[in-house]
A protein has these predicted regions:
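Glycine-/charge-enriched secondary-structure boundary and capping motifs
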Residues: 1-24, 124-162, 202-273
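Short, Lys/Arg- and Gly-enriched loop/turn segments at beta-strand edges
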Residues: 192-198
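Glycine-rich phosphate/pyrophosphate-binding loop regions near the starts of catalytic domains
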Residues: 25-192, 240-242
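Well-ordered alpha-helical segments embedded in enzymatic catalytic cores
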Residues: 84, 88-92, 200-204, 226
Length: 273
């Protein structure tokens, strides 16, 4: 039995506030470097991979092990708060995996309006259910969290915004993917679209990371933006036509490693020139 099993459960009035699908706001895919670059990225000189693509990595001296750290909150809350909770967890875990880390723990921050209003109570409950479903699929615990409620202006609530942080263990920071190089094969790793499939893809990527030169998840903006971001990070441009579902992962490796990766859902995109 866990201590949380004896915690009281609060029942609030709820009212579905589902909204029709809407296109992604272009503002959401603009670079955010101007925000996080204001903060010290080299605390105690342990940073071996700076933020900017998926997750940052800190070395755990004196060993060569490291911590991969990521924070994510996809802008899906107004459309579907359950999906927002699910994707916040999966995005954060994918980011950690792309940096070579095994996701080990989650923390959340739930930002909502007044939960005493039935529609806000419904949004909050659905987001929590989404976080729980994804965490269970990953078998990764939510070990902490906080809430920011009653966020309203003139009676109008902020969009439901679940944010999730993930930390993971990197076995050897010397094997963290650094960026693709000319001649590398670029592939798209996909899942079957289920939570179990997404969890399996995340496991595959962090286990394969020592053989990869780069891994980067497909999120807001689709495949084109993912390739653009990976190109900028690596310093070598690569483009490919096509589309990819949310949660797919672009990976790159030396050609001799391509056939031995062992994931059943791989699609070749090309080779870095």
């Amino acid at each position: 039995m866990l201590l949380t099993d004896e915690c009281p459960r609060y029942e609030v009035d709820t009212l579905s506030a589902a909204r029709p699908a809407a296109p992604v706001d272009p503002v959401n895919v603009e670079p955010k470097e101007w925000v996080y670059e204001q903060y010290d990225q080299l605390v105690l000189s342990r940073t071996v991979r700076r933020p900017g693509l998926d997750a940052a990595v800190l070395r755990l001296r004196p060993s060569w092990r490291g911590l991969a750290v990521s924070l994510d909150g996809p802008p899906l809350g107004e459309r579907d708060p359950f999906a927002a909770g699910v994707q916040a967890v999966l995005d954060a875990a994918r980011n950690v995996a792309c940096a070579g880390g095994e996701p080990l723990a989650l923390t959340d921050c739930l930002n909502f309006g007044n939960p005493e209003k039935p529609e806000i109570g419904w949004e909050l409950g659905r987001a929590i259910d989404g976080i729980a479903a994804a965490a269970e699929a990953l078998q990764v615990p939510v070990v902490s969290g906080n809430v920011s409620l009653y966020n309203e202006t003139d009676g109008r609530a902020i969009p439901p915004t679940p944010v999730v942080g993930c930390v993971g263990l990197v076995p050897d920071v010397r094997e963290v993917p650094r960026g693709w190089s000319p001649g590398d094969a670029v592939l798209l790793a996909e899942s079957d679209g289920t939570l179990v499939g997404d969890a399996g893809l995340i496991r595959f990527v962090w286990q394969a990371a020592p053989r990869l030169s780069l891994a980067h998840d497909v999120s807001d903006g689709g495949l084109e933006l993912a390739l653009t971001e990976a190109s900028a990070w690596s310093g070598h441009e690569f483009r490919a036509e096509g589309s990819a579902r949310l949660g797919s992962i672009v990976i790159a490796c030396a050609p001799e490693h391509k056939d031995g990766l062992g994931w059943p859902h791989l699609r070749a995109l090309g080779e870095v020139a």
